[in-house]
Each structure stands twice: as C-alpha cells, then as structure tokens.
A protein has these predicted regions:
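Short solvent-exposed beta->alpha transition segments
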Residues: 60-137
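Exposed beta-sheet edge and beta->alpha loop/turn motif
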Residues: 135-217
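Short regulatory "switch" loops immediately downstream of catalytic or recognition motifs
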Residues: 45-52, 72-81, 166-170
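Short, flexible helical or helix-coil boundary motifs
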Residues: 8-11, 39, 47, 74
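Short, low-complexity N-terminal intrinsically disordered segments enriched in polar/charged residues
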Residues: 22-65
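Intrinsically disordered, low-complexity N-terminal regions enriched in serine/proline/glycine
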Residues: 5-6, 24, 117, 156, ...
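Bacterial Sec-dependent N-terminal signal peptides
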Residues: 1-30
Length: 217
C-alpha cells in the first residue's frame, strides 16, 4: 500500500481554478480516487486492530491514535481561514470535530458520535472480558466505491468513498452474540502539494455516515 503523508490543511474554499484537459482531469481523478480509497482502508485496518482481542490494551490505544491522525483535526475542533475580498486571511472559523454515525439492527436510525469517542468506545469494548472475540471486517480498498471527484479550489478536491463494514461479537463460549453489516460513506478531502520532488497527495478524512444497516447472513 502506498504510504500517504498526513497533514492538516485549512482554507478549503480558496478562489482560483486552473483549466485541465478532459484526459488529464480523468487521469488525475483516478489517482485521487485510488489514494482516497487507500486512506479509508488504513482507517478500517485500524478498526480491526483496535477490536482484536489478541492485541495488548496499550496497542489498541496506539491504533486509536493512528486512526485519529487520518482525519481533519485529528478528532478535535479544527479551523479554516476566513478571507476578505482581496484573499487576505481576516479570521479563523471553527468547525466541530468530525463525526461517525453509528447504527444497530435494534436502532437503525443513525446517531452521531465524534470519531474520537467512537474509537474510544471500541477500545473499551475490546478490553471487556465478557467477549471471547470482537471483529470488524471491511471492504478491501480496491473494491470500495468512489463518487465523482469534485474540485473545490485550486489543487483541492473532495470525494465520497463507500464501503461495507461487518461487526461481530462472540461470548466466552464462542457463541455469536451480535452481528450486522453496515454500508458507510466517508467524505475525503484531497490537496495536491507541488514540491521539488514531485506532486504529493495530502489526504484527510471527514465525517462518516451510515447509509444502511442490515443482518449479516
């Protein structure tokens, strides 16, 4: 998997666009889509490691911290720039921490939690001794679906990545306690950095929505 550098980038609404030919734009969109899917896959890998009963508690917390680094604001309040008509920064605009929608078969209506809280709940769940195993299995990155890549500013893009997530928990006698399958949509922000060594993608995840939850059969 290609290593992706993580940075927090702000001012997503900068003005100015550079025209691209259709072929160049299509090629760039494919690269962005693949990079976005791989970023989401890194997040889902962290989820599976967090709930793995074979992991030490301190390792679960490390995976939680790694997962938070994939998001805008790293799970905390983040800011973007407010510009005047000349493009000068005149203020900072705060945004609430990114959220994850959670659902269940009993409560299918999505409920929002901060990503930081969601991940902490997974750590606590995996640390409970009442479960023999807890697992989260997600779509492989190459099978994830991506919406149309949209340009929002110069060298800045956004898209939505769709994946399925299967949750399963088993009791001490290995009896299945609960399982479901949820389709999720995550907003992904991409910025292109032009460096002396070539172009780099800076990728950060935004809010995650649960679009459908059903029985895992």
């Amino acid at each position: 998997m290609k290593v992706i550098k993580y940075y927090i980038f702000l001012a997503l609404m900068l003005l100015g666009f550079m025209p691209l030919s259709a072929q160049v734009y299509n090629d760039l969109s494919e690269q962005i889509a693949d990079a976005a899917k791989q970023q989401v896959a890194q997040f889902t890998d962290c989820l599976s490691f967090i709930v793995d009963k074979g992991q030490k508690p301190e390792n679960r917390n490390e995976f939680r911290e790694d997962a938070l680094k994939l998001f805008i604001g790293q799970g905390k309040t983040y800011y973007d720039n407010v510009l005047d008509k000349e493009g000068n920064v005149i203020d900072k605009r705060p945004h609430d921490p990114v959220t994850m929608e959670v659902t269940s078969l009993r409560n299918p209506k999505p409920r929002k939690k901060s990503v930081a809280e969601y991940l902490l709940n997974l750590v606590n769940l995996a640390n409970q001794k009442t479960y023999r195993s807890v697992s989260i299995m997600s779509t492989q990155w190459h099978d994830m679906k991506v919406s149309q890549v949209r340009k929002i500013a110069e060298d800045q893009y956004v898209c939505d990545v769709y994946f399925e997530q299967i949750f399963e928990s088993r009791g001490l006698e290995n009896k299945l306690i609960y399982t479901d399958k949820t389709t999720k949509r995550v907003t992904v922000f991409i910025k292109i950095l032009h460096t002396d060594y070539g172009d780099e993608f800076v990728i950060l995840l935004g809010d995650i929505q649960a679009t459908e939850t059903k029985k895992n059969v």
